[in-house]
């Protein structure tokens, strides 16, 4: 008899596209499309599984990324969350599906209790039953350009630019872009 494997909880990362569309190499464009980063200043929140980390490393010169905290994620959901039909994500909509607040679902996602923030049409959910996600939430967030501007979209964060890994400092950038 096989022993049950423990569920691996991967860290949650916010990935923001900072560079535009012209002259994007085809393989980079395909990877950005798989990550659902189709426009400049869009953000996705992903779990740091090995396959996703490989995609992020491939597009490292086009995006910035780092660990998102629950407070920032709750604020993003409140201000920039959209459901299908381009309607804003509201507290009433969350309560309809059994979530009590934006903070509750953000904490559950960052802690690894739920695997995904959004679930689409394929997942069958009965109304009143609490789903492990937000039904029909768009899987990306459209942000404003950052207040105060960017340093450089040609240099990495470690050398004074804005691209690449920035760790928990991504939360400061996200707050400037809300």
Swiss-Prot record:
One of its GO terms (molecular function) is RNA binding. Signal peptide: none annotated. SUPFAM superfamilies: Ribosomal protein L30p/L7e (SSF55129). InterPro entries: Ribo_uL30_ferredoxin-like_sf, Ribosomal_uL30, Ribosomal_uL30_arc, Ribosomal_uL30_euk_arc, Ribosomal_uL30_ferredoxin-like. The keyword Ribonucleoprotein applies. CDD domains: Ribosomal_L7_archeal_euk (cd01657). The keyword Ribosomal protein applies. Keywords: Ribonucleoprotein, Ribosomal protein. It comes from the Archaea. GO terms for biological process: maturation of LSU-rRNA from tricistronic rRNA transcript (SSU-rRNA, 5.8S rRNA, LSU-rRNA); translation. Transmembrane segments: none annotated. GO terms for cellular component: cytosolic large ribosomal subunit. Part of the 50S ribosomal subunit. Belongs to the universal ribosomal protein uL30 family. HAMAP family: Ribosomal_uL30_A. This is Large ribosomal subunit protein uL30. It comes from Pyrobaculum aerophilum (strain ATCC 51768 / DSM 7523 / JCM 9630 / CIP 104966 / NBRC 100827 / IM2).
